[in-house]
Amino acid sequence: MVQPELTQSVGYGIVVGLGLGFAALMIFVSWSLKKFNNENQTSEHFNTASHSVRTGLVASAVVSSWTWASTLLTSAQKTYQYGVSGAFWYASGACVQILLFTVLAIELKRKAPNAHTFLEVVRARCGPIAHGVFLVFAYITNILVMAMLLCGGSATISSVTGMNTVAVCFLLPVGVIIYTMFGGIKATFLTDYIHTVIILVILIMFSLATYSADKKIGSPGKLYDMLKEAGDAHPVAGNAQGSYLTMRSQEGAIFFIINLAGNFGTVFVDNGYWQKAIAANPASALPGYILGGLAWFAIPWLAATTMGLVALGLENKPYFPTYPNRMSDLEVSEGLVLPYAAIALMGRAGANATLLLVFMAVTSAASAELIAVSSIFTYDIYKQYVRPRATGKELLYTGHASLIVFGFAMSGFATGLYYGQVSMGYLYLLMGVLVCPAVVPATCVMLFSRVSTIAVTVSPVLGIISSIITWLVVARAEGGKTLTIETTGANNPMLAGNVVGLLSPALYILILSIIFPEKYDFNRLLATFAMHFSSEEDEIQQTKKLNRASVISKVAALIITAAFIILWPWPMYGTGYIFSKRFFTGWVVVGLIWIFFTVFAVGIFPLWEGRNDIYQVVSNMAASIFGRKVNDIVEDEGVVVETISIGSGSKEKVNFEKKDIESV
């Protein structure tokens, strides 16, 4: 039994204190934006941020939403198991989905610019039955992602501080629920930014401690020597020469395919990513998603290349938490490679940094899931089927209630998984089996006019039946005719289930579209979710920009995807190249350079891009403090904004009707 490095009081201080602190900060920020920047918290703004978010914040939000606890913990786990290939297979296998999703984000902006959720688009094109099918898949995705966040976060926090795991499961969502309620998706974007910056600072600290400052390692060359010794002591089955320093890893390649397939589901079917596309300014969707995808790659790659390999290098040292034993399979599956490596590397400081790192990763991604669930319930269930004429305030309160219920329901579900010994690693591999069957149909809804309604409706159902049967049959065949957590969680059953889940719906769609042919006119979709422009010229210009962005997104996404999943890794896999010390040093240096690019892209650039808004809020706040009254009167039926020119003191009153707001 490994003794916790920190006390329970430290854990409660972070989980409760910092969570409530963030909630208080976002309440203050939301109030400031309302009072000094004329941002009214209507249901529209709560769920879509009035379609106004710029490139930098979109990129930051994409990075933060995709930086789960598993991004840091599972990537380090796979590197510990398979060596340097594990970090790359995780990063590349989960990066390309964001880049390819850029295509769908632009198509959503072109064809349904005023939608609140992707499911609204499904209903408008394919009817209520298809809407119900995709509603189920969307909720399965949100439930799995939230469960994984809570399972991974609670296991790590409990191991580092000794906190009761059940208490962590219930306390982690509290602060997130509060600040998401008060700020909506705009608060999610802003906290995403803060969380991302903190995560990057901690990762850079770990990297510098490993490769430059720490006497335990101190350089890439010394870590290389340690990894050579580790490979000699316990070679990796399926790796070239049993080495940790090669991309030729049989089990690593299997994980790559599982990772690649499964993560299509958690991006393309998660309403949270569609929400960010909806909230983005039309001109910001393309650069925001591409910049976010490229920036995100460095996080798991460098985190795992550093901490996963540090665990291998220091595991035989007396100060490693499990010494003299290696980590158990359960500890590895629970994602404890990174925290144990941090403790061995930096002691109590490493434990504190890990606690903060995991807290930030869990809460930032959880806020996106809460908003996604809230939006679906508000617009796709309540307004669609319960109260079609619901007022803005009623929709806002409904959204608040739904995210509270979902947050605490997931705490209970995560607790059940904990007692059932279902780990974060198991859930991560299982995702694709359950949610990938909706990926191809969702893509077809936005891209192809000749896919029939029956094909879109039926193919996900047939796909999930096929994937579950395949998964369980392979598990039973390879596991001695018994189905357990161990046998169903093995690589081969998960590989089979994920691949069938992703690809079989494509076959079903083709067959059903041939049997039941149909051609859909996307102009009908545009008419349903049209944006209102001040002039016809503005509309023409916007259409031209989005058409151009559509072409660019397709070309850019395909080129970058090919580089990440084919051109870079497979030649190294095919040759079975064993890294030299010089090559390994260069590999690490590229990772460090890339993480500083990420800092610029999602840390510095959003501040520069939003400098005018920051100046306006600070100026108006200063004017209010020093006696110049700034009024912002907000009503449910409309908005009356009274502004003051700080230089001249002159007033201007602008009236907006409710219908004008809803059309923005």
Curated annotation (Swiss-Prot):
Which InterPro entries does the UniProt entry name for this protein?
A: DUR, Na/Glc_symporter_sf, Na/solute_symporter
Name any one Pfam family assigned in the record: SSF
CDD domains, per database record: SLC5sbd_DUR3
Q: How does it sit in the membrane?
A: Multi-pass membrane protein
What GO biological process terms does the UniProt entry carry, in alphabetical order?
A: putrescine transport; spermidine transport; urea transmembrane transport; urea transport
Q: Which GO terms describe its cellular component?
A: plasma membrane
List S-S links within the chain. Answer: none
Gene Ontology molecular function, alphabetical: putrescine transmembrane transporter activity; spermidine transmembrane transporter activity; urea transmembrane transporter activity
Function recorded in the entry: Involved in active transport of urea.
Family stated for the protein in its record: Belongs to the sodium:solute symporter (SSF) (TC 2.A.21) family.
- This one is known as Probable urea active transporter 1
Q: Which organism is it from?
A: Schizosaccharomyces pombe (strain 972 / ATCC 24843) (Fission yeast)
Taxonomy, top ranks, is: Eukaryota, Fungi, Dikarya, Ascomycota, Taphrinomycotina
